[in-house]
């Protein structure tokens, strides 16, 4: 009975609810419940859609899985870079240890000549030369002939002026050893035969090294990289030790001076030594040749070190194919400049006159004071002019529209380092001269000229370095020259003609030169004038110390102040660097001229 009553009550409630839903004017209470049910059913679908979108976004941001080939190739590249760094580190440590060992021998010879003699140092250097010589021959005969050994060449390495200087100084060093052999043979009664052996080994080493560096200085070796790096560093360390020995060893100079003193005593009838040359004329030629060519040996060692370092950096290097497709620099054409070459030629002519007069006077027993005055007066006139030209060029660089070349360039970085490092040679001599003059006799005319020369030399080096480095970091204008114009000019073949046509062609060429000069931008024109003027001035200042004019050592002021051996080491350290600086400056100024 109770269950039936509950069922009837439920039916009655359902009936009332249905009547309320259909009666007009009443609020529908059941509709929200239906909507809530629909929203409840749609909520899982929305959550599913949100989860799918989040998964898609996560999949888009998640790094893609690389294929096995890409991962394997990346691993090989990383291993190759690590192996290259390890090879560079090991070869650098090898060179460092060889230099320290040789430096210890040379310092021991200087400070304790009884325990370590010059012969011991020569034995060590001869061993290093033989090892380097064997590696050079192996490199040419085996390494470079292997398949895919040299696939690329660095177009910026080994420019023509570097290779030309290498051959020039190598030839002078070879002749220096010939003079040394002749001098030793003429004194064979009191000379060790080992000296002849050492000179012959050095001649063979210089000849082979010059030939290999001339031929292979641009190589980017891809096989036997570690062995090649070690061989290059061993050869570099050998050249560096030869330079250190040439700077510090004054035994040959002292021997020549002692022999000249003996000859003077013999002429007065007080002969005390029988170890004299039998042929006086030949010995005089050997002595003069040795003293004149001695600075070239140090310059040769420095250039070899620079070339070997570039080759060491290029081992295992991959050069992009487009780097060798076009020339690294524009062809050199002398146009757009008139006054700079004229002033430079005047400086060159005056420098040749001073050089000839000084050399003629130096052939006598003593050099008169007026020739030192003439030499330093020439420098005091030229150096401030060069400094002003460099400062003007640096200011014009700041006004130019050309962009800075910010692309990483190892060759340009090495050029800047060599330029700054080579400038330390002459600047060091200048600072030592300033101290000696101020401490002794600053009131004499010659000493005042030397003081002014030293100060102006320091200023000129600083100004010229600023000008060259600023020019090297500017983007060259020849890179943006339209190729169609160049192709159009090159497309016209040369043709023969009569003398009348030749004269008309020369007239047109001169008119075109004047036209191009008048239509050049004034900034470009000024840079071309300054660059050509500085090129000729640096050639003049390179020629005078390179071919035997060394007033820094002959005037006697600094030699008396510091002592013979110390001043000998200072001059032989600074003069070769100074000659190398002038040469390197000419190369940098040519690039600045071409870039303008």
UniProtKB/Swiss-Prot annotation:
Disulfide bonding pattern of the chain: none
A Pfam cross-reference name: Otopetrin
Family the entry assigns: Belongs to the otopetrin family.
Subunit structure, interactors included: Homodimer.
Molecular functions per Gene Ontology: identical protein binding; proton channel activity
Ranges in the topological domain labelled Extracellular: 110-119, 182-193, 249-295, 359-372, 436-446, 548-566
Annotated catalysed reactions: H(+)(in) = H(+)(out)
Protein name: Proton channel OTOP3
Biased segments, Basic and acidic residues type: 43-59
Bias (Low complexity): 1-21
Protein function: Proton-selective channel gated by extracellular protons.
Membrane topology, as annotated: Multi-pass membrane protein
InterPro entries: Otopetrin (IPR004878), Znf_C2H2_type (IPR013087)
Region of interest called Disordered, as start-end residue ranges on this chain: 1-59
Cytoplasmic-facing ranges: 1-88, 144-159, 218-225, 313-338, 396-413, 470-529, 590-596
Modified residues (Phosphoserine): 21, 23
One of the GO biological process terms: proton transmembrane transport
Residue intervals passing through the bilayer: 89-109, 120-143, 160-181, 194-217, 226-248, 296-312, 339-358, 373-395, 414-435, 447-469, 530-547, 567-589
Coarse class of the protein's main subcellular location: membrane
């Amino acid at each position: 009975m109770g269950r039936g009553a509950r069922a009837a009550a439920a039916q009655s409630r359902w009936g009332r609810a249905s009547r309320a839903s259909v009666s007009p004017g009443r609020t529908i209470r059941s509709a929200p419940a239906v909507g809530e049910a629909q929203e409840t059913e749609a909520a899982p679908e929305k959550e599913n859609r949100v989860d799918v979108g989040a998964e898609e976004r996560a999949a888009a941001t998640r790094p893609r899985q690389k294929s096995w080939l890409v991962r394997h190739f990346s691993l090989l590249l990383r291993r190759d870079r690590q192996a290259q760094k390890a090879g560079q580190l090991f070869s650098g440590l090898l060179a460092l240890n060889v230099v320290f060992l040789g430096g210890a021998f040379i310092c021991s010879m200087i400070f304790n000549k009884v325990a370590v003699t010059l012969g011991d140092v020569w034995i060590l250097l001869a061993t290093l030369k033989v090892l380097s010589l064997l590696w050079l021959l192996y490199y040419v005969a085996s390494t470079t002939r292997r398949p895919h050994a040299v696939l690329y060449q660095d177009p910026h390495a080994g420019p023509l002026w570097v290779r030309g200087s290498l051959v020039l100084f190598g030839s002078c060093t070879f002749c220096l050893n010939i003079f040394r052999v002749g001098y030793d043979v003429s004194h064979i009664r009191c000379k060790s035969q080992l000296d002849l052996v050492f000179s012959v080994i050095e001649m063979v080493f210089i000849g082979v090294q010059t030939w290999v560096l001339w031929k292979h200085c641009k190589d980017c070796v891809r096989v036997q990289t570690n062995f090649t790096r070690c061989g290059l560093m061993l050869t570099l360390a050998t050249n560096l030790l030869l330079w250190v020995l040439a700077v510090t060893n004054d035994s040959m100079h002292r021997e020549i001076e002692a022999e000249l003193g003996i000859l003077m005593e013999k002429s007065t009838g007080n002969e005390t030594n029988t170890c004299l040359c039998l042929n006086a004329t030949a010995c005089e030629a050997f002595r003069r040749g040795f003293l004149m060519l001695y600075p070239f040996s140090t310059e040769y060692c420095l250039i070899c070190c620079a070339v070997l370092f570039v080759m060491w950096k290029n081992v295992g290097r991959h050069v992009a194919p487009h780097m060798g497709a076009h020339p690294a620099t524009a062809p050199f054409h002398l146009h757009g400049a008139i006054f700079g070459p004229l002033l430079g030629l005047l400086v060159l002519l005056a420098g040749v006159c001073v050089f000839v007069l000084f050399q003629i006077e130096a052939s006598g027993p003593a050099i008169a004071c007026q020739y030192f005055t003439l030499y330093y007066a020439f420098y005091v006139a030229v150096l401030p002019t060069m400094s002003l030209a460099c400062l003007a060029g640096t200011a014009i660089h700041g006004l130019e529209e050309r962009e800075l070349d910010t692309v990483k360039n190892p060759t340009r970085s090495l050029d800047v380092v060599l330029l700054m490092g080579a400038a330390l040679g002459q600047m060091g001599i200048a600072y030592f001269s300033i101290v000696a003059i101020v401490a002794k006799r600053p009131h004499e005319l010659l000493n005042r000229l030397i003081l002014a020369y030293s100060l102006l030399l320091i200023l000129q080096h600083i100004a010229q370095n600023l000008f060259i480095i600023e020019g090297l970091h500017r983007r060259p204008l020849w890179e943006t020259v339209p190729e169609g114009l160049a192709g159009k000019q090159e497309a016209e073949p040369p043709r023969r003609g009569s003398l009348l046509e030749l004269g008309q062609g020369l007239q047109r060429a001169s008119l075109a030169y004047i036209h191009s000069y008048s239509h050049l931008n004034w900034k470009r024109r000024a840079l071309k004038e300054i660059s050509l003027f500085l090129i000729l001035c640096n050639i003049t200042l390179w020629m005078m110390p390179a071919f035997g004019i060394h007033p820094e050592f002959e005037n006697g002021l600094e030699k008396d102040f510091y002592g013979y051996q110390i001043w000998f080491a200072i001059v032989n350290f600074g003069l070769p660097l100074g000659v190398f600086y002038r040469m390197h400056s000419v190369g940098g100024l040519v690039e600045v001229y071409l870039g303008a």
